[in-house]
Amino acid sequence: ITYTDCTESGQDLCLCEGSDVCGKGNKCILGSNGEENQCVTGEGTPKPQSHNDGDFEEIPEEYLQ
């Protein structure tokens, strides 16, 4: 299983769907159009990434440091 994750708080690189939240000590606030999600500090859990059409792409390694 792979997990989507959030980058640093405040960056627009949340890879979550619906009301699911990301790990790394951040949670996701969804944008109104689904494309302006933001990471904010807060409790969160990793979200299992599905393998269906329309999946989010994995975050590049440089964002996970």
Curated annotation (Swiss-Prot):
A GO CC annotation given for this chain: extracellular region
Attached carbohydrates are found at T45
This protein's source sits in the domain of life called Eukaryota
- Chain segments carrying region Disordered: 39-65
- Keyword field contains Zinc: no
Q: Name one GO molecular function term.
A: serine-type endopeptidase inhibitor activity
Secretion signal: which residues? none
InterPro entries to which the protein is assigned, alphabetical:
Hirudin, Hirudin/antistatin, Prot_inh_hirudin
- PTM Sulfotyrosine: at which residues? Y63
Pfam families per UniProt: Hirudin
Q: Which UniProt keywords apply?
A: Disulfide bond, Glycoprotein, Protease inhibitor, Secreted, Serine protease inhibitor, Sulfation
Record bears the keyword Transferase = no
Q: Where in the cell is it found?
A: Secreted
Segments of skewed composition (Acidic residues): 55-65
Q: Which residues does the annotated region (Interaction with fibrinogen-binding exosite of thrombin) include? A: 55-65
UniProt-annotated stretches for the region Interaction with thrombin active site: 1-3
SUPFAM superfamilies registered for this protein in UniProt: Leech antihemostatic proteins (SSF57262)
Q: What are the cysteine partners in each disulfide bond?
A: C6-C14, C16-C28, C22-C39
As for family, the record states:
Belongs to the protease inhibitor I14 (hirudin) family.
State the protein's purpose. Answer: Hirudin is a potent thrombin-specific protease inhibitor. It forms a stable non-covalent complex with alpha-thrombin, thereby abolishing its ability to cleave fibrinogen.
Q: What is this protein called?
A: Hirudin-2'
Species of origin: Hirudo medicinalis (Medicinal leech)
